[in-house]
């Protein structure tokens, strides 16, 4: 029987900075364990002289502490470290492949507040780690066996700073946009969330010819995601009105997700982006197997519009890693999450907010169509999502009344083509409740009942 992972969650290691497991001490151990595991992966060990790991981060203050700790661990195992500084998570994945490194690591807590941080790992090919490798790394951290593995003084690794990593990623992102098109004549608002995309996204858009109004582009280590970015898109939508812009782009802290605003200030989420891009690819025979991969959180309206156009939607559990795994298993090339993680596998190995925005811009420019009109391509089913902060993640079937209420809600909502989804977040102390159906009042009724039952028993 496999031992449960103790520090790896659904997207690497994450928590409050300087509190276990996101401490310098654990980062050092993770660095040592990761260095050893990647150095000895059978597929890589045969063909390499010196081994190397790319190390990037977002703009959090605690990134300095974790960067130095994890790099020290890696170096101590005889593996070189390639520092690339603040760069979007998809940029770290791309540079890992570009530099032919053994692995990539990015220090980020994505959309979380600045006082959280985390550590994500990528394989040599830019995809996220298999569970097996995560288990191997974690077992070395907790078993103590890593303490008995000590390369000699002349075998330790070297640290090198890669100065052109940002430029490499910028050119990679631009390559996802057709050479025959420019963004001349377009005014675009970009909210960078004071995060890792604060240089790359405005730069790419300007180089493609757009007039860019950038905000959330002055990180100070503590303002990442604070009242800005994809978690707080109101500022972006307001600036659309102020500047009479054609489009708004809002990233999260590591720029692996994106939300958009049309020219009227109307917000578009990942489901809207999937509908627009999937239908466009389908119309041009570019959607592999005529299939879009989405999670259980995505709106049922996606199925309706794709099926009407001759396509289909395959669903996975929540998490972009689950989406990517499904895409890899079957060769699909488009997938995403309602939250704004979008994977265009023709260009990227992971969620990339900038590349996703460029694909929508391509469709707008090619068709001469404003985003508000493109967004009318599908009809969203009424959906209500509640996030309940919890003090503990007790199994739902052990809570009084919760299973009964969920079952009753499912019975009523299924009669109108709806559904209920209740789960705990894999990255935050929250229970997430999704209700979907044809009648908003019914959704609100059941959301209130189930949320109240949860708050009484496990609410923070």
Question: Which ranges hold each PLM region?
Answer:
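Phosphate-binding and adjacent anionic-ligand microenvironments
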Residues: 247, 284-460
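Gly/Ser/Thr-rich active-site loops/lids in small-molecule metabolic enzymes
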Residues: 128-130, 214-215, 266-285, 353-362, ...
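Proline/glycine-rich low-complexity loops and linkers
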Residues: 91, 135-170, 175, 263-336, ...
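Short glycine-centered, acidic/aromatic-flanked micro-motifs in structured strand/loop junctions
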Residues: 55-58, 190-192, 262, 346, ...
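N-terminal small/polar loop signature for handling phosphorylated ligands or for N-terminal nucleophile
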Residues: 40, 44-46, 52-116, 203-261
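Buried hydrophobic positions in well-ordered alpha/beta secondary-structure cores of metabolic enzymes
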Residues: 11, 55, 92, 105, ...
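An N-terminal, well-structured beta->alpha segment
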Residues: 1-72, 76-77, 159-186, 398
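Gly/Ser/Thr-enriched, mixed-charge loops and adjacent short helices
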Residues: 2-3, 16, 117-240
């Amino acid at each position: 029987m496999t031992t449960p992972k103790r520090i790896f969650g659904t997207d690497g290691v994450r928590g409050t900075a300087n509190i276990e497991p996101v401490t310098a001490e654990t980062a050092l151990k993770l660095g040592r364990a990761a260095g050893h595991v990647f150095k000895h992966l059978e597929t890589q060990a045969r063909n390499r002289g010196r081994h190397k790991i790319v190390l990037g981060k977002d703009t959090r203050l605690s990134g300095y502490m974790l960067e130095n700790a994890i790099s020290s661990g890696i170096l101590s195992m005889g593996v070189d470290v390639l520092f690339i500084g603040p760069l979007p998570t998809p940029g770290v994945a791309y540079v890992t492949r570009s530099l032919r490194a053994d692995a990539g690591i990015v220090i980020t807590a994505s959309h979380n507040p600045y006082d959280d941080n985390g550590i994500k790992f990528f394989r040599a090919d830019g995809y996220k780690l298999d569970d097996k490798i995560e288990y191997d790394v974690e077992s070395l951290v907790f078993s103590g066996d890593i303490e008995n593995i000590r390369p000699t003084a002349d075998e330790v690794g070297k640290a090198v700073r890669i100065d052109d990593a940002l430029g490499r990623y910028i050119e990679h992102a631009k390559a996802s946009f057709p050479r025959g098109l420019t963004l001349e004549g377009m005014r675009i608002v970009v909210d960078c969330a004071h995060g890792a995309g604060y240089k790359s996204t405005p730069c790419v858009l300007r180089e493609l010819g757009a007039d860019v109004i950038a905000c959330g582009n002055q990180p100070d280590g503590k303002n990442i995601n604070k009242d800005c970015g994809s978690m707080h898109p109101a500022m972006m939508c307001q600036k659309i009105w102020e500047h009479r812009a054609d489009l708004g782009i809002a990233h999260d802290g590591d720029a692996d997700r994106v939300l958009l605003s049309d020219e009227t200030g109307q917000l578009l989420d990942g489901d809207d982006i999937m509908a627009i891009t999937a239908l466009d690819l389908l119309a041009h025979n570019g959607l592999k197997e005529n299939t879009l991969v989405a999670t259980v959180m995505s709106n049922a309206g996606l199925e309706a519009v794709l099926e009407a156009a001759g396509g289909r939607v395959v669903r996975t559990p929540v998490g972009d890693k689950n989406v990517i795994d499904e895409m890899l298993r079957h060769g699909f090339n488009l997938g995403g999450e309602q939250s704004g993680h979008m994977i265009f596998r023709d260009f990227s190995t992971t969620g990339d907010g900038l590349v996703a925005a460029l694909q929508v811009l391509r469709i707008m420019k090619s068709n001469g169509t404003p985003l508000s009109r493109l967004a009318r391509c599908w009809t969203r089913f009424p959906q209500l999502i509640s996030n309940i902060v919890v003090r503990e993640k007790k199994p739902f079937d052990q809570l009084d009344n919760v299973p009964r209420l969920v079952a009753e809600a499912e019975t009523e909502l299924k009669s109108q083509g709806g559904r209920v989804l209740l789960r705990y977040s894999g990255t935050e102390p929250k229970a997430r409740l999704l209700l979907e159906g044809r009648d908003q009042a019914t959704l609100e009724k059941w959301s209130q009942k189930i949320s109240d039952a949860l708050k009484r028993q496990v609410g923070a």
